[in-house]
Amino acid sequence: MISVQNINKFFGSQQVLSDIYVDFEEGKTNLIIGASGSGKTVLLKAIAGLHNIDSGNIFYDNTDFTALDDKQRIAIHKQMGMLFQGAALFDFATARENVRFPLDFFTDWSLSRKNERVDFCLNRVNLGDIGDKYPSELSGGMQKRVGIARAIVMNPRYLFCDEPNSGLDPQTAIVIDRLISELTHEYKMTTIINTHDMNSVMAIGEKVVFLYQGKKEWEGSKRTILQSSDKALNDFVFASEMARLLKEPKF
């Protein structure tokens, strides 16, 4: 479990996270939702150690991540998989080389052992035949799946996904959602996903946290979202649904 306890984050004089307290459940898909500027990406990056916080604590099980020095944090970083917005693949590297990067950085495995693990992960995301292709030769959905293969190559305990469906068509987004959900349960990972897509929430969300203006406004299950009386949450759900309808093809 990952426990966030009363964290605060400022950029200059602007407070972007205010007294956030939430537990993210082990072995489940935990979704952070909110409008642009609500603080969800900052929160995700703070949990992953990519942003320092100004106060509060972040616990990985019983370990206070915020109290560790950089060297001590490496042990936890090795247990993290990250899927960045846009997949963030290296253009100069093949799909296989992109997936292998964490193994090159964190392990002293032989090249044959690394490639065996890489090929296993590419096959797991149904891309076993594209290892020698470059990102420019792949569709957006295929790039996202390469990113997912890279995220799981270290057999992580924690998976962080920043807007995994950004830029994808609805059908491809469904495929990515299902794949992330399957891998979460297969690897028993604590998965945290940032999204503004209510389709993703209703499809795979097991715990949902709603941020509003840098604060935790609401948390619960996807089944209770539509029963909530929280005005900010209801406004967000309505706006998300309107945006979805406007994107649908007109006949």
Name what the model sees in each region.
Residues 134-138, 142:
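Conserved ABC ATPase signature
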Residues 111-129:
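Conserved ABC ATPase "signature" region
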Residues 153-157:
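A short, proline-enriched helix->beta-strand linker immediately N-terminal to the Walker B motif
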